[in-house]
């Protein structure tokens, strides 16, 4: 984390549910680790956290009720060692709780100074539109941006969401830009996934995807990246940043080399012919 900040990265995404080693038994640990890393550097960073996911078996241990939201923001701030997050995100829709109750609670958090802005994750376009309308009717702080998956292998946001983002001037945080590593260059359709990797543990699904359109996208990405002396991960993520609707992509890094690879996705533009090839080969994932 410190190395990433030293290289100029200033946006770090977190959540109350995130633990270590993807183990939900360790929930909250990511915020604790992040809090230690950003100590004395907080003012130069944009930090997010999230609320909704289950953090226990109790009746108030999940969802978007006022009780859960107000309790979890305090817990997140304590773990992060800060008095505010820059964007507090609704992690997922909660059909059990009235949207008005959720938005009022989020507004209270902004008014109290515990968050600067409010956003949402994993909402379809109609739900974002509904949230904007309800917030307007209530006269409360509205969402300023969304966080949804977007990549060469998942372009569904282009159907409705992108037009909404442009019209309402909302920010877009694209997560899973490498499609769980499929676009990283580590995986190739003609080869078995590396032993111990995520897709080696999901071999049947991997094989099925590589025989479909995913395999063609990956082969094209690798070929084009080689032609311009970039890595597949850099090209895949630069393609995301080329979209005017996208504000930032969120990419996980397990090592300094991964951080350096991700940083190599910014600061340059993709040639129009390469853009055309990537758009065409991945067109089926925009439907």
Model-derived features: where do they sit?
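Acidic (Asp/Glu)-rich catalytic clusters
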Residues: 5-6, 35-46, 77-81, 110, ...
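A short acidic, helix-capping loop that chelates divalent metal ions and anchors anionic groups
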Residues: 18-22, 54-60, 258
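Glycine-centered flexible beta-alpha turn that most often forms the glycine-rich phosphate-binding loop
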Residues: 12, 85, 118
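Active-site mouth loops of central-metabolism enzymes
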Residues: 55-70, 91-97
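N-terminal binding-site loop/beta-alpha segment at the start of enzyme catalytic domains
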Residues: 1-45, 287
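Beta/alpha (TIM)-barrel catalytic core signal, keyed to glycine-rich beta->alpha loops juxtaposed to Asp/Glu
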Residues: 93, 97-286
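Short, acidic/polar
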Residues: 1-4, 64-80, 128-133
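Active-site groove signature of glycoside hydrolases
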Residues: 77-97
